[in-house]
Structures are given as C-alpha cells and as structure tokens.
Amino acid sequence: MSLNFLATRFTCSWPWSTMVLLCDGRLVCGCADPYGKRVLGDLRVMPTVSSVWTGEIASQLRRDIGSGGSKFCGDCPLKLPLKKDEPPPHRPVDAGVLPSRLYIECTAACNISCNQACCAPETGITRTRQAGMLDYDLFTRVVDETGPTLGRIDFFNYGEAFLHKRALDMVEYIKAHFPHVYLYTSTNGLAFSEDGARRLARSGIDEVTFSIDGARQDSYVRYRQRGDFSKAIRNLAALADEKRRTGGDVPFINWRYILFTHNDADDEMDLARRSAAEIGVDRLCWEITDHPEDMFSRRFVPGTADYARIENEIWDKSYLGNAIPGATPRARIEVGGSSWLDRIGNAPIKGISGQPIAISTRVTNLSARPFPARASYGRRLVRLGAQLCAADGTLIDRDYERAWLPSSLPAGKTVEIVMTLKAPDSPGRYRLKFDLVSEGIDWFEQAGSPTTTKDFIVG
C-alpha cells in the first residue's frame, strides 16, 4: 500500500484542476476521500461552483501546498511526497474561475459488497453523506455552469452510479449539452438491464469501464460479494453489441480485472482473454493491488517473472496495454533521410538550421487491430511522432512533430509517410526518436512497441 498519506512535506496538482461533487451537493478536492472529510464547499448553500473553486478554503489550500503541504489534506493518499530540500512546484493561487475536470457521484450506495473495500456498505459510507442520491436539478445546475470549460467528467466516485434512477438521463444530458466534454464512467455493470446497457452505448459517452474480477461466478463473487457474473457479462456484451450495431467509435469499452489469489491462475486469465475477444470489448487489463491482505495476488507482485510477463497488460502501467491477444498496439518504423538509400547504412538525417526537411518513413502495423487515422471524439487516432533529443539522448521536445496516417492502417499492412519538420534553429548534433502515438492516450513505446532513433545533424 502506498505510504504517501504519511507525507508531511508534499505537493499535489488536484486543487488546480479537479473537483469532486458528492451526492449530497458538497464539493471535495480529490477522488480519494471516501468519507467526505476534505470539504471545500456545499452547493446547497453556496451559489455556484465558481464560488467554491475561487473561495477562501480552496485558495488557502493552494497557498499551503505551494509552501510544501497542508493540514487540510490529512491522510489523503493523493499526496506526492517531496524529497529532502526539494522545493514545491510553483503554481499561482489563482487557478481560474472553474475546474477543468469534474467527478460526479450519483450515490455512495452500492448493490454489492466488495470484500474489505473502503466503500463497501458495511463501512457505513452512506452515513457520511447527507443525501442518498444526487438531486437532478443540482446536477444540471452544476453541469450547466461548468460544462463550457470542462475537458472531462468522470461519472462515478464511490458507490454504483447507475443505481440512481436518472443516471442514464444524466449521461445523455451531458453529451447532448456539452459534446466536447470527454465523459467516462466505471461500473460493476449490475445496476441496469441489457436495454439500459444499449442505451448507454447510444448516449455518446466516450469511455466505459466494467469491473469484473474473474472469468467464472465462483471466483468473481469472492471479491464482488453478492455479485452476478453472468449478468455483468451479459450487460458488457450488450454494450459492445450495440456499439457494433450503431457503427460508432464510442464508447471505448474496458474490462478491468483485479488479480487476487483466487483468480490469477493461467486458465482463468486465458478464459477472460478469450471472453473479452469474443464479446468485442476494446481493452482487457489486469489491475495489481496490495489489499485485502489475505486476498491480493502474490504471483504478480512487481519484480516477479510473472509480473514482467504481463507488465504491458496492467491497467495503470500503460493506457494502451491490452491482455486481449494481438490487441496491444505494436509497430515497426523505418526511417530514411531525403531518400530511401539513406536507410541502407543507417545514415544520419541532415538538415539546415531553421529550415524544413522532409523525412521518408515506412510504418508497419505489427498488431492484430487496425490503427485508426481519425476519431469522432479526437482521441485514440494514431499519428507518427518525432521526438527531438540531444546527442546524448536527453529528451528536448517530446512533441516535436507529428504526421497523419493517410488512412486507417490495417493489421499487418505497411504505409509510407513523409514527415515534414523544421530543423532546430541552433546548429549541432541531435537525435530524432520516432514512435506512434495514440492521441490523448499514450505513446506506443509505453506498451512495449519498438521505436526508431536516428542521428540528426543540423548545419
């Protein structure tokens, strides 16, 4: 378990970007506050989200963190400890009028009891809220105020969001009024019917995660107590089927599977891989945990050979890694200079300072899924990227240049791309590192895909 909560000198970026709306109308500053102990304001008595975001409590919190810590944060695990004598990052107290990201908690209640979880019904979490369900009018008020400037809404916090009888209405409201907002939710998949899952697929929501920890009922229910594996899988399948039927590229569908001692055998993990592929989910990932103490997987502890084998399939290791066979994106990138002959001897790329240079490349899709060249929601489209590095490999500019794929690149196929970039203004020796990037998600290298690096001589 992370010991960040023990830090007395720390930093944190959340108060500059994010707020969490609890189901009773109070606003807290982070998603790791199950019992609502760090309240910034209460929208039942305060007029606007902005009045909370720019208010004295939030402003003082930013001042304190800018000085190296705040008592307000208490045991929050989101704290990032500072090293001895390390100065805290300098950020202005003025964080703008509104946050750029918002979590919305519909309810703290849940329809199952996850073994020893901090939000299980037995913990009394619902008694820490002053209302059982989020008021719909309060919801629309908050979304109407913040929507124009939000980049993302996470439609969940503690509890199961879709227990709220108007949860699907809320999802549809957000996407109808603020289609630019990236809308994400996480669910156990048990609170709606198959028709509800299909409605969710049609809502325009950008990404949905189903948490299903097992490939059979007997192992699944060990952690998701009172859960129904068959129902969760049926709803997951209905969501994926409706996405296929409508022909859209959203929602992106994740199956997240926490590894425990009772569900981490190869046969069960392979069954999950096959099921995910058959259902048609976009991504299956394993989650590594260190609790409950008597349940977490010892087999996949970081540093073990088994962990290394699935490292690129782990939920928070890479946002592109995928346990479905062939679904992790991999590419081969061949790079020439001004002609294909340059590739024969690995000749350096040469340019004139401040002048454009055209670089010929060949990109081959080594995975089993196509690389999309376009996306309706501006994410997960794939482009070729060039990262500028010093001669010793030190990164100078990760986003130095991009080039579009001419069209979606099918599995096993190759495309020629000419990238035009401007040479640095200062002559010298550099290096260019080429990789593909899933825009808004991650570089392919983070999921284990090979990159290509070329010397870059600028005269």
Identify the meaning behind each predicted range.
Residues 371-375, 440-451:
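Beta-sandwich strand segments
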Residues 368-395, 435-437:
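Short acidic, flexible loop segments centered on an aromatic residue
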Residues 37-40, 80-207, 222, 234:
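Conserved alpha-helical substructure of the radical SAM core
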Residues 1-47, 51, 105, 129, ...:
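Radical SAM enzyme [4Fe-4S]-AdoMet core and its adjacent flexible, acidic
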Residues 363-367:
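Asparagine-centered strand-capping/turn motif at beta-strand->loop junctions
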Residues 420-428:
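Short, surface-exposed loop/turn segments at beta-strand-coil junctions that are enriched for proline
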Residues 340-341, 381-383, 389-405, 448:
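Short beta-strand and strand-turn-strand segments in soluble, beta-rich domains
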Residues 2-15, 50-103:
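N-terminal [4Fe-4S]-dependent radical SAM core
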